Amino acid sequence: CSVRAIAQCSRFAVLRTTLMRLITQMASSAPSALHPILLCDFYSKLFIMYIFNNFINTLRRYKASSLLNVIGMAVAFGAFYVIMTQVSRDFGYNQRLKDADRTFIIALPSNYSPGKYNTWICRPLGEALVNGSSSVECGGMFQAWHGEPEICWTRHGDTVRKMRLTTMEYSAGGIRTMNFEAAEGSLEELSRPATLAVSETFAKKNGVTVGDRISWSDPEGEKNAMEVVAIFRDFQKNSDLGYVEGVYDAGNSHMDSTTEWSFQYVVKLRDASQRSEFETEAMPVMREFLSRLYRIDDSAGEEDKAEFEEMLDRMSVKLVSLKEMYFTKVLDGKPGESGNLTTDITMLAVAVLIILIALINFINFFFALVPARLRSVNTYKIFGVSRSSLVLNFIGESVGLVLLSLALAALLVYAFAASPLSDILSSNVGIRDNAAVMALTVSVALVAAVGGSIYPALYITSFQPALVLKGSFGGSAAGRRLRNVLIGFQFAISIALIVC
């Protein structure tokens, strides 16, 4: 080891001398004001070359440990990235919808699950609640759930195109409340019969334009067709509106029906803090509506009035924010997609534990090589290399290993995304769709590399050259004690992962 270290130091000295001659020649022909800049640039490039050269030599000399380190960290970083795509998707669900913080779905007490609410109401009640509070900016009927795409056809001249389209039913107020924006055409045209609007993605995919007609019953695309009057901008993908491909105006359908409780209503408040105000103002509206529904007036019997008051005591109106919809547990038969907050927190904890295991493995590998590298490190010190340079060299080696691991992790993620295993997640693990998660993974990896190498680097460079021949940390009681602590901690983390 010392012979190799001497050779490396000699090569480094020759390289430094050669480059110094070049920089001197350049400086002699450059203005004096540039001399400090040239020298700074020279030493920075020289130091980078020194670290890179040592990193390559380390890979060559310690092939087995380097390979195991890279593979282990690649699996850990890949697993961390995949898990975090799901966690990021769930915590971001509905969060970027415009005005999501002050947009709420109306819910009433569930008849089937005491203490919970459901979002199904009749249109007369929904309209009354929307119009009965001064805190409402706008509101209307909307559809948070989506069905399966249905086969439909459209005709372009002599060509008929077969498509699959998922449509949803909204009222005009619901369209305004959910902030539909027309990219082409006009959403106001939806008030006309037999019209619909489609999303930008659907329009581009199928070549649909404003003025086209779509039929669900005629393969020729003509009979019973609906006219496309607008193309609306796509919504956030991981949201209840991300599935909307087509929308049409429900008009006055079921507007007078008090027996069809299969509609959902949404309101946008003037301010998010007015939630309790709306819930309070909704109760007189509920009383008036229910009294008409059950014909409770002055002519009603005392027993009927008592039962009615008892029912009102159990009645309440609750607003559930769009931002809370995904994780909320207060709804029975929740519309749209739903998630489990406990599961996501557990997944987040697992991701962190995986990184900790990888970090411990990395530190153990580093300390396992201390006896083999100690002599060469002190040879460098004898030849005048400063301790800070050696520490930075070890940190540079760690960063290099992490970068190799990240490259391999990207390949593993790509293979996972192309395999059937990716179906177990509801998130898209593609790197292009998860730039923030990718940036987080790289940041965590680099921080782990630097943090995990600082103490070992400081330790291995702390010995005086004259004392190196007297013993070995690898066989000392302190060395064994540290390794046992790390292995025990790693074992505890593994047990925690199994339990989770």
Each model region followed by its residue ranges:
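Short, strongly hydrophobic transmembrane alpha-helices
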Residues: 61-89, 483-500
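Intracellular coupling helices
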Residues: 52-64, 68, 358-401, 462-474
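Small-residue-rich transmembrane alpha-helices
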Residues: 318, 398-465
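Feature of multi-pass inner-membrane transport and sensor proteins
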Residues: 17-20, 24, 38-53, 57, ...
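Mid-to-C-terminal secondary-structure elements
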Residues: 30, 171-183, 198-339
